[in-house]
A protein has these predicted regions:
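Structural motif corresponding to the intra-repeat A-B loop/turn of tetratricopeptide repeats
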Residues: 16, 56, 95, 133-135
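Inward-facing hydrophobic residues that define packing positions of alpha-helical scaffold repeats
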Residues: 26, 65-67, 104-106, 112, ...
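TPR/TPR-like (Sel1-like) alpha-helical repeat modules
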Residues: 140-156, 176, 187, 191
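Helix-turn-helix DNA-binding segment
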Residues: 198-247, 251-252, 260-275
């Protein structure tokens, strides 16, 4: 009960543009629970702190949670960790990996449908819609429509508006024929969240800066300390072509030297940590 009340308070504080207060609410509760040995609640508290980090733009902290505490077990679903799975998908979206987010979300779908988890289903559909939209897959319209239909039926606003700037362009594009009064309230709430947190779930690489498949292959070889000549031989392309690709890669990663590219690529999860 104590966790539920504090969680509601923190979400209300976050929605009101008070992320520092929301963080303090969860951190104080976490410390109290840890002292009392109530460790089973701590993973969800850590996931909630991760969401606050993403709202405030601290993606390094969010990445630390992802590396150290995210479930990352797509073949072994634990429904008690669904809040953490949803958080994991959010980090993956912020990292510019919509495919990874979809892989994380997919196992939740049968459970959510079979057990009629309405709120979880809305979150699942909104996050799936955002991921599909970023993949330029028109299937996002169906998923967002399903989320809006369910949210409107129960008069939920915050369940959708929490995604703020990440869902705003989708809502502006979607031709949804549901309750107009409710939609007006929703759009106002979404715009408020977008104003409070303008970079929430925004990919680190803008669409025009995303690496092409060829550039990703060359990046892997570059980070494996292959020379331009070796890359040209492996890729079966001319040396000037490799040099052009390397130049584009460095520009997109906003670095000057090849050595810096590896660090930037790991931070963006474009290459494995052990490469």
């Amino acid at each position: 009960m104590e966790f539920a009340v504090s969680g509601l308070l923190a979400r209300s504080q976050l929605a009101s543009g008070q992320p520092a207060d929301a963080r303090r609410t969860i951190e104080v509760l976490r410390e109290c629970f840890a002292e009392r040995g109530l460790t089973r609640f701590l993973p969800n508290m850590d996931a909630m702190l991760c969401r606050i980090d993403m709202h405030t733009g601290d993606l390094d902290a969010a990445d630390a949670w992802y590396r150290e505490k995210a479930p990352r077990e797509p073949t072994h679903l634990n429904v008690m960790r669904r809040y953490q799975y949803l958080t994991q998908a959010m980090v993956e979206l912020a990292d510019g990996r919509p495919d990874a987010a979809l892989l994380t979300l997919a196992p939740l779908e049968p459970y959510i449908q079979n057990c009629a988890r309405i709120i979880d289903g809305i979150h699942l559909n909104v996050l799936t819609a955002i991921a599909l939209h970023r993949k330029r897959d028109e299937g996002w319209r169906e998923r967002l429509t399903a989320a809006l239909d369910a949210a409107a039926e129960y008069r939920f606003i915050r369940t959708v508006s929490v995604y703020g700037t990440a869902v705003l362009p989708l809502l502006e594009t979607l031709d949804w024929d549901g309750n107009k009064a409710w939609r007006k309230r929703l759009m106002a709430a979404v715009r408020t969240q977008a104003a409070f947190y303008p970079h929430f779930l925004e990919p680190r690489l803008a669409p025009g800066e995303e690496l092409t498949p060829t550039e990703l292959q060359i990046l892997h070889l570059l980070c494996a300390d292959k020379s331009n000549a070796e890359i040209a031989q492996i890729m079966d392309v001319k040396l000037p072509t490799v040099k052009t690709h390397v130049s584009h890669i460095l520009d997109k990663l906003d670095v000057k030297r090849r050595a810096e590219a590896r660090t930037a690529a790991k931070k963006l999860r474009l290459i494995p940590d052990d490469l």
